[in-house]
Amino acid sequence: NQCTNSDELEKVMNENKIRGYIGFDCTAPSLHVGSLLQIMCLRLLQKYGHQPIVLLGGGTTRIGDPSGKDETRKILSEKQIEKNIKNIEKVFKIFLKTKNTKTKPIFINNYKWLSKLNYIKFLREIGKHFTINKMLSFDSVKLRLDREQSLSYMEFNYMILQAYDFLELNKTKKCLLQIGGSDQWGNIINGVDLIKRHSSKQVFGLTTPLITLASGTKMGKTEKGAVWLEKNLLSPYDYWQFWRNTDDRDVFKFLKMFTDLKIEKIEEIKNNNINDLKILLANEATAMLHGKSAAKKAEQTAKKTFDKKSVGDDLPLININKGE
């Protein structure tokens, strides 16, 4: 989507093994498929010998990211944030390999350093690099103000703290790359600029597009609610069905984004029967999260239910009271 210097980044990554990070909000009890493209980016980094850093926003979640939001988020209790962090970590341990010491993911919580900041020192050393003029120009701030919606001073500071995260990871973990959704471009640029001004080091920022379905809706939720990457919140069968119900126009794109199939293989089969491709997508995506046997079982349940008009063993059941 966007990159601060794509040619130089490619050169650096070809010549060295680097560390790259993505920050994840911890406001929800787990992650949903709206975060899956970011997870796949970390998976790709690892696949090619680089080391992913998963930054868990224990500190910034206590403030709230105003990007793309129309109103101030509800502040969660510290206990709830810690519980969310543990659940989110579990998701990454499924998608990322944790055994190879050179590429295993580094999990780090930004509360570790944000909670220790001295306010006066922070303003003198970090705040001096940010101008109100520039901060007011970012969409996350501008849109809220243009709509005459309130933006707290706490939220206004979010972009500075995110930039500081990159500086901290660069200093302590030699991290050279931050990846995020396209709505994070302004925050990422702030981090790149801060490091350049603070230590004259070259680092990079890269964004991925926000995935919009062919229907025009944002990826991550359905009429039934969020498509969670957690079997206690969404059954493997329902997860399989989400992918099986992909719009025809999105199937080819999703096979490239959300499976480990090689591009050559996807190109080779792209003209196959669309329903066969949807089943392939559902099986590959479900196997990655829940395992091959769960994917196969979900497919068999769907076949029994829809082809043979019988009820499969793992079809989710809902109890309805007689009066309802």
Q: Over which residues does each language-model region extend?
A:
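A charged helix-plus-loop insertion that forms the helical arch/lid used to bind
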Residues: 66-82
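N-terminal regions that are enriched for targeting/export leaders
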Residues: 1-6
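Short acidic, glycine/serine/threonine-rich loops at helix termini
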Residues: 64-68, 117-123, 217-223
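Short, hydrophobic/aliphatic alpha-helical segments
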Residues: 15-23, 45, 52, 163-172, ...
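Conserved nucleotide- and phosphate/pyrophosphate-binding catalytic cores
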Residues: 197-324
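Divalent-metal (Mg2+/Mn2+/Ca2+)-assisted nucleotide/phosphate chemistry catalytic cores
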Residues: 77-78, 84, 94-207
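N-terminal catalytic cores of NTP/NDP-binding nucleotidyl/phosphoryl-transfer enzymes
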Residues: 8-66, 178-185
